[in-house]
Amino acid sequence: MSISGVVKLGKPSKKAIFSMTDSALKRVKEIMNDKKIDNCIGLRLGIKERGCSGMSYTLDFATQKNKFDETVVADKDINIIVDSKALLSVIGTEMDYIEEPIKKEFIFINPNATNTCGCGESFTTKDFSIPDLKLPKKN
């Protein structure tokens, strides 16, 4: 099962790899209690190429942690496992959950996002590529 959300530009309220508001935490707990996934160790946060702006979030139930993944403890009952390939793009992101008369959705407030598409489903981040390094020549 995947959980989708909308991306918002802006600054999160906390400085962390990834954080969740109380409303997001409450909703994630409800979903996890409803699904009862065997051997679930938390939620895996990742990104994939999709949408007008290039990237969107993936949030799935995790049954194992990969070697370079980062574990963030959102609550004593919830671990967020950040996929190593997504780490630079999501550092500082805060996940929120809103309920309005016409929609209920998760929102990701990502300080690294430089652009979002019109519907907010996808985003672009700063370029984190490492420039070519010029090493000194050995004599």
Curated annotation (Swiss-Prot):
Record bears the keyword Iron: yes
Compartment list: Mitochondrion
GO molecular function terms listed in the Swiss-Prot or TrEMBL record: 2 iron, 2 sulfur cluster binding; metal ion binding
Xref: Pfam families: Fe-S_biosyn (PF01521)
Record keyword Transcription present: no
Chief site of localization: mitochondrion
One GO CC annotation: mitochondrion
InterPro entries referenced in this protein's UniProt entry, alphabetically: Fe-S_cluster_asmbl/transfer (IPR050322), FeS_biogenesis (IPR000361), FeS_cluster_insertion (IPR016092), FeS_cluster_insertion_CS (IPR017870), HesB-like_dom_sf (IPR035903)
Function (record text): Involved in the assembly of mitochondrial iron-sulfur proteins. Probably involved in the binding of an intermediate of Fe/S cluster assembly.
Family recorded in the similarity comment: Belongs to the HesB/IscA family.
Protein name: Iron-sulfur cluster assembly 1 homolog, mitochondrial
